[in-house]
């Protein structure tokens, strides 16, 4: 699949070719030089459960080389060492979930309230670079610096 992406006054083309069973997430992120670039994150799910939810962290922030995602108020390490330009995903029980992302031991953004996770559904946390240091999104919805 080929796509043309326009962000502000910049336009670029991106080709996406998926392998069978592969999921690809495409994001536009700041390139550090005042422009934008397209990034593809690929994952091949190892399992699916209709009784559990799936949650992932996508780390697009090179200034946060090892993000951690915890349950808000706890240091339980839902995800540890989520390296830049990588994705981690895992199955979790369908419970009410509020998570906090941290970079280098410091909270990044505000806690993300997913509400009740639904069985069989996929949820994502995005860690993005900004001039303020980092932006955290859940499923594409901005939640703070």
Predicted regions mapped to residue ranges:
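Intrinsically disordered, low-complexity polar regions and short flexible loop motifs
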Residues: 1-145
């Amino acid at each position: 699949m080929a796509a043309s992406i326009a962000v502000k006054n910049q336009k670029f083309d991106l080709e996406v070719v998926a392998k069978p069973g592969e999921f690809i997430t495409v994001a536009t992120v700041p390139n550090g030089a005042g422009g934008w670039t397209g990034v593809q994150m690929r994952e091949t799910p190892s399992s699916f459960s209709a009784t559990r939810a799936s949650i992932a962290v996508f780390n697009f922030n090179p200034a946060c080389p090892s993000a951690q995602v915890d349950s808000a108020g706890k240091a339980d390490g839902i995800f540890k060492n989520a390296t830049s330009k990588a994705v981690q995903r895992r199955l979790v029980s369908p419970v009410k979930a509020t998570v906090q992302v941290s970079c280098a031991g410091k909270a990044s953004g505000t806690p993300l309230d997913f509400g009740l996770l639904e069985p069989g559904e996929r949820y994502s946390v995005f860690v993005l670079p900004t001039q303020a240091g980092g932006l955290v999104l859940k499923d594409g919805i901005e939640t703070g610096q």
